[in-house]
């Protein structure tokens, strides 16, 4: 059965943890979908893991759509959500509607994700959801704000924690169907999760969220450098290097084909 938004709410109500991972191409998406991942995120992190940029900022909406199309072709069951990249929605509400509309119409994704919980972001969410565009929110560490906030943990002071709680509540009231909590203290994530009726998806936010997401390149051990809160379940980088070295040796020594 294909994943739906009501299932996510039901999962929270019934205490079933949600599994989310990122994908950037057809092959990875097909594998994640076949493994029963609930949510596949076409994250703007692909700017770094697939395109070699140092931050997520350079990736364009056209590039995100290109990758999301490939991901959606590989998915039969999982819910696909695509990030709106930097400066594809911040300029105006009309720009956000055009960008989100393009993603849904051109890719087949079921929703979009945007960062931040400030007043402009909340208004944007309200407008998008009012015309039927499903939106996932994202608070805490927001990579599109890297030059202002850096990659450090957010919500460490009482003032910052209260701000993030207020943002989370405002985003739920604006209509987001789920909320990513990135790199915030465990107790803060637990508080937010208990206050919301929508599911929270944690990344570096502890065990008390309604689900967890990782960048798949980190999970597979493909990344040269990964965040301290990520976990590698495989050293795929080493396995690929080993396989390529063995192939090269066999070719050069006349053993293959």
Curated annotation (Swiss-Prot):
Pathway terms, separated by semicolons: Cofactor biosynthesis; (R)-pantothenate biosynthesis; (R)-pantoate from 3-methyl-2-oxobutanoate: step 1/2
Keyword Oxidoreductase assigned: no
CDD domains: KPHMT-like (cd06557)
Cofactor annotation remark: Binds 1 Mg(2+) ion per subunit.
A GO MF term: magnesium ion binding
Signal peptide, first to last residue: none
Cofactor: Mg(2+)
Entry EC no(s): 2.1.2.11
Amino acids binding Mg(2+): 44, 83, 115
Residues engaged in binding 3-methyl-2-oxobutanoate: 44-45, 83, 113
SUPFAM superfamilies attached to this UniProt entry: Phosphoenolpyruvate/pyruvate domain
Domain of life, source organism: Bacteria
Keywords recorded for this protein, A-Z: Cytoplasm, Magnesium, Metal-binding, Pantothenate biosynthesis, Transferase
Compartments reported by the entry: Cytoplasm
Pfam families, alphabetized: Pantoate_transf
Membrane-spanning ranges: none
Active site: 182
Record function comment: Catalyzes the reversible reaction in which hydroxymethyl group from 5,10-methylenetetrahydrofolate is transferred onto alpha-ketoisovalerate to form ketopantoate.
UniProt similarity note: Belongs to the PanB family.
Xref: NCBIfam families: panB, PRK00311.1
Binding partners and assembly: Homodecamer; pentamer of dimers.
Protein name, as recorded: 3-methyl-2-oxobutanoate hydroxymethyltransferase
Organism name: Rippkaea orientalis (strain PCC 8801 / RF-1)
